Amino acid sequence: MNDRLCFDTRTATWATDVARTRLSTYRARRDFSRTAEPAGDQPITASGAELRFVVQKHAAARLHYDLRLELDGVFRSWAVTRGPSRDPHDRRLAVEVEDHPLAYGDFEGSIAQGQYGGGTVQLWDRGTWQADGMDPAQALATGDLKFTLHGERLHGSWVLVRMKRDRTTSRRADWLLIKHRDGEAREGDADALLADGGSVASGRSMADIAAGRGHIPIPWRRG
Protein backbone atom coordinates (compact mmCIF):
# COMPACT_ATOMS: atom_id res chain seq x y z
CA MET A 1 0.00 0.00 0.00
CA ASN A 2 1.22 3.52 -0.79
CA ASP A 3 2.42 4.91 2.53
CA ARG A 4 0.94 8.29 1.59
CA LEU A 5 -2.52 6.84 2.09
CA CYS A 6 -2.11 5.96 5.76
CA PHE A 7 -0.48 8.33 8.20
CA ASP A 8 -0.62 8.99 11.94
CA THR A 9 -1.27 12.22 13.83
CA ARG A 10 2.40 13.17 13.91
CA THR A 11 2.60 12.82 10.14
CA ALA A 12 -0.62 14.81 9.79
CA THR A 13 0.98 17.66 11.76
CA TRP A 14 3.99 17.54 9.44
CA ALA A 15 1.69 17.53 6.41
CA THR A 16 -0.14 20.59 7.77
CA ASP A 17 3.13 22.51 8.13
CA VAL A 18 4.26 21.53 4.64
CA ALA A 19 0.86 22.43 3.16
CA ARG A 20 0.90 25.88 4.76
CA THR A 21 4.31 26.55 3.23
CA ARG A 22 3.23 25.30 -0.17
CA LEU A 23 0.08 27.44 -0.09
CA SER A 24 1.98 30.72 0.30
CA THR A 25 1.58 31.59 -3.39
CA TYR A 26 -2.12 30.70 -3.31
CA ARG A 27 -2.71 33.01 -0.34
CA ALA A 28 -0.58 35.86 -1.66
CA ARG A 29 -2.72 36.08 -4.80
CA ARG A 30 -6.05 36.37 -2.99
CA ASP A 31 -7.85 38.86 -0.78
CA PHE A 32 -9.98 36.63 1.44
CA SER A 33 -12.10 39.59 2.52
CA ARG A 34 -13.33 39.75 -1.09
CA THR A 35 -13.42 36.13 -2.22
CA ALA A 36 -15.36 33.17 -0.86
CA GLU A 37 -12.51 30.81 -1.73
CA PRO A 38 -11.11 28.87 1.25
CA ALA A 39 -8.02 30.35 2.90
CA GLY A 40 -6.53 26.91 3.45
CA ASP A 41 -5.60 27.50 7.08
CA GLN A 42 -7.24 24.36 8.48
CA PRO A 43 -5.03 21.52 9.78
CA ILE A 44 -4.63 18.36 7.71
CA THR A 45 -6.45 15.51 9.46
CA ALA A 46 -5.06 12.00 9.57
CA SER A 47 -6.90 9.65 7.23
CA GLY A 48 -6.46 6.17 5.84
CA ALA A 49 -8.59 7.01 2.81
CA GLU A 50 -7.58 7.16 -0.82
CA LEU A 51 -6.33 10.36 -2.36
CA ARG A 52 -8.94 12.75 -3.69
CA PHE A 53 -9.22 14.51 -7.05
CA VAL A 54 -11.49 17.21 -8.41
CA VAL A 55 -12.08 18.86 -11.77
CA GLN A 56 -13.55 22.36 -11.67
CA LYS A 57 -14.99 24.08 -14.71
CA HIS A 58 -13.74 27.65 -14.47
CA ALA A 59 -15.12 30.50 -16.57
CA ALA A 60 -12.34 33.03 -15.93
CA ALA A 61 -10.77 35.22 -18.63
CA ARG A 62 -10.83 32.00 -20.67
CA LEU A 63 -12.96 28.95 -20.00
CA HIS A 64 -10.85 26.02 -18.81
CA TYR A 65 -11.00 23.00 -16.50
CA ASP A 66 -8.84 22.84 -13.36
CA LEU A 67 -7.55 19.35 -12.57
CA ARG A 68 -6.54 18.95 -8.92
CA LEU A 69 -4.84 15.87 -7.45
CA GLU A 70 -4.44 15.53 -3.69
CA LEU A 71 -0.83 14.95 -2.66
CA ASP A 72 1.06 15.75 0.55
CA GLY A 73 -1.77 17.77 2.09
CA VAL A 74 -2.56 20.03 -0.89
CA PHE A 75 -4.12 19.83 -4.33
CA ARG A 76 -1.46 19.83 -7.04
CA SER A 77 -3.21 21.75 -9.80
CA TRP A 78 -3.24 22.16 -13.58
CA ALA A 79 -5.41 24.36 -15.81
CA VAL A 80 -6.48 22.13 -18.71
CA THR A 81 -7.15 24.69 -21.40
CA ARG A 82 -9.61 22.66 -23.50
CA GLY A 83 -10.79 20.28 -20.81
CA PRO A 84 -10.08 16.54 -20.47
CA SER A 85 -10.68 14.21 -23.42
CA ARG A 86 -11.30 10.46 -23.32
CA ASP A 87 -9.77 10.11 -26.80
CA PRO A 88 -6.16 8.84 -26.48
CA HIS A 89 -5.28 10.75 -29.66
CA ASP A 90 -6.06 14.07 -27.95
CA ARG A 91 -3.20 15.66 -26.04
CA ARG A 92 -4.65 18.41 -23.91
CA LEU A 93 -2.41 21.24 -22.67
CA ALA A 94 -2.36 21.34 -18.86
CA VAL A 95 -0.66 24.41 -17.41
CA GLU A 96 0.68 23.81 -13.91
CA VAL A 97 -0.60 26.40 -11.44
CA GLU A 98 -0.12 27.03 -7.73
CA ASP A 99 -1.06 24.40 -5.16
CA HIS A 100 -4.56 24.76 -3.71
CA PRO A 101 -5.88 23.82 -0.24
CA LEU A 102 -7.85 20.60 0.13
CA ALA A 103 -10.90 22.65 1.14
CA TYR A 104 -10.95 23.94 -2.44
CA GLY A 105 -12.31 20.55 -3.46
CA ASP A 106 -15.73 21.62 -2.17
CA PHE A 107 -15.66 25.16 -3.59
CA GLU A 108 -18.32 26.08 -6.11
CA GLY A 109 -19.39 29.66 -6.73
CA SER A 110 -18.31 32.97 -8.16
CA ILE A 111 -14.97 34.71 -7.68
CA ALA A 112 -15.40 38.47 -7.80
CA GLN A 113 -14.21 40.23 -10.93
CA GLY A 114 -10.90 41.95 -10.27
CA GLN A 115 -9.81 39.11 -8.02
CA TYR A 116 -7.31 36.50 -9.15
CA GLY A 117 -9.18 33.99 -11.32
CA GLY A 118 -12.36 36.06 -11.26
CA GLY A 119 -15.33 34.17 -12.72
CA THR A 120 -17.63 31.20 -12.11
CA VAL A 121 -16.39 27.87 -10.72
CA GLN A 122 -18.35 24.62 -11.00
CA LEU A 123 -17.57 21.22 -9.48
CA TRP A 124 -17.55 19.27 -12.74
CA ASP A 125 -16.09 16.00 -11.43
CA ARG A 126 -14.68 14.51 -8.24
CA GLY A 127 -13.61 11.20 -6.77
CA THR A 128 -10.41 9.38 -5.87
CA TRP A 129 -7.17 8.71 -7.70
CA GLN A 130 -4.12 6.51 -7.41
CA ALA A 131 -0.67 6.63 -8.96
CA ASP A 132 0.23 3.77 -11.27
CA GLY A 133 3.64 2.37 -10.41
CA MET A 134 6.11 5.03 -9.26
CA ASP A 135 5.65 7.11 -6.11
CA PRO A 136 3.55 10.10 -7.26
CA ALA A 137 5.91 12.78 -5.93
CA GLN A 138 8.83 11.14 -7.73
CA ALA A 139 6.77 10.73 -10.88
CA LEU A 140 5.88 14.43 -10.87
CA ALA A 141 9.52 15.34 -10.32
CA THR A 142 10.51 13.31 -13.38
CA GLY A 143 7.66 14.80 -15.42
CA ASP A 144 5.72 11.60 -16.11
CA LEU A 145 2.79 10.82 -13.78
CA LYS A 146 0.64 7.84 -14.70
CA PHE A 147 -2.54 7.58 -12.65
CA THR A 148 -6.04 6.14 -12.48
CA LEU A 149 -9.17 8.19 -11.81
CA HIS A 150 -12.31 6.91 -10.09
CA GLY A 151 -14.69 9.82 -10.60
CA GLU A 152 -18.30 10.47 -11.48
CA ARG A 153 -17.38 11.44 -15.05
CA LEU A 154 -13.72 10.55 -15.53
CA HIS A 155 -12.47 6.99 -15.13
CA GLY A 156 -9.56 4.81 -16.08
CA SER A 157 -5.86 5.38 -16.72
CA TRP A 158 -4.34 8.75 -17.64
CA VAL A 159 -0.91 10.36 -17.83
CA LEU A 160 0.43 13.86 -17.19
CA VAL A 161 3.63 14.43 -19.17
CA ARG A 162 5.72 17.54 -18.65
CA MET A 163 6.74 19.06 -21.96
CA LYS A 164 10.42 18.52 -22.74
CA ARG A 165 11.32 22.20 -22.86
CA ASP A 166 10.22 22.51 -19.21
CA ARG A 167 11.94 19.41 -17.80
CA THR A 168 15.20 21.12 -16.81
CA THR A 169 13.69 23.99 -14.84
CA SER A 170 12.10 24.22 -11.42
CA ARG A 171 9.48 26.74 -12.55
CA ARG A 172 5.84 25.88 -13.07
CA ALA A 173 5.54 24.11 -16.36
CA ASP A 174 3.36 23.11 -19.27
CA TRP A 175 2.19 19.50 -19.28
CA LEU A 176 0.04 17.32 -21.52
CA LEU A 177 -2.97 15.41 -20.16
CA ILE A 178 -3.52 12.21 -22.17
CA LYS A 179 -6.01 9.36 -21.80
CA HIS A 180 -4.47 5.90 -21.95
CA ARG A 181 -6.04 3.21 -24.13
CA ASP A 182 -8.24 1.14 -21.85
CA GLY A 183 -11.88 0.22 -21.38
CA GLU A 184 -12.74 3.82 -20.46
CA ALA A 185 -11.16 5.39 -23.58
CA ARG A 186 -13.44 6.74 -26.31
CA GLU A 187 -11.67 7.32 -29.62
CA GLY A 188 -13.30 10.09 -31.63
CA ASP A 189 -15.12 11.28 -28.51
CA ALA A 190 -13.22 14.61 -28.45
CA ASP A 191 -15.32 17.05 -26.39
CA ALA A 192 -18.53 15.02 -26.12
CA LEU A 193 -18.13 14.47 -22.38
CA LEU A 194 -17.77 18.21 -21.78
CA ALA A 195 -21.29 18.78 -23.09
CA ASP A 196 -22.60 17.20 -19.88
CA GLY A 197 -22.65 20.46 -18.00
CA GLY A 198 -24.32 19.97 -14.60
CA SER A 199 -22.40 20.18 -11.32
CA VAL A 200 -21.69 16.82 -9.68
CA ALA A 201 -22.21 18.48 -6.28
CA SER A 202 -25.33 20.56 -6.85
CA GLY A 203 -26.69 19.78 -10.31
CA ARG A 204 -26.42 23.48 -11.17
CA SER A 205 -25.42 24.89 -14.54
CA MET A 206 -22.74 27.55 -14.85
CA ALA A 207 -25.50 30.13 -15.34
CA ASP A 208 -27.25 29.02 -12.14
CA ILE A 209 -24.01 29.28 -10.17
CA ALA A 210 -23.23 32.72 -11.58
CA ALA A 211 -26.72 33.91 -10.61
CA GLY A 212 -26.61 32.31 -7.17
CA ARG A 213 -29.56 30.05 -7.97
CA GLY A 214 -30.22 26.43 -7.05
CA HIS A 215 -29.01 24.03 -4.41
CA ILE A 216 -25.97 24.45 -2.21
CA PRO A 217 -23.28 21.96 -3.32
CA ILE A 218 -23.07 18.78 -1.26
CA PRO A 219 -19.59 18.39 0.29
CA TRP A 220 -17.62 15.35 -0.82
CA ARG A 221 -17.37 12.47 1.61
CA ARG A 222 -14.61 9.88 1.63
CA GLY A 223 -15.68 6.28 1.33
Predicted segments, located by residue:
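A charge-rich, low-complexity, intrinsically flexible signal that marks solvent-exposed coils, linkers
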Residues: 2-223
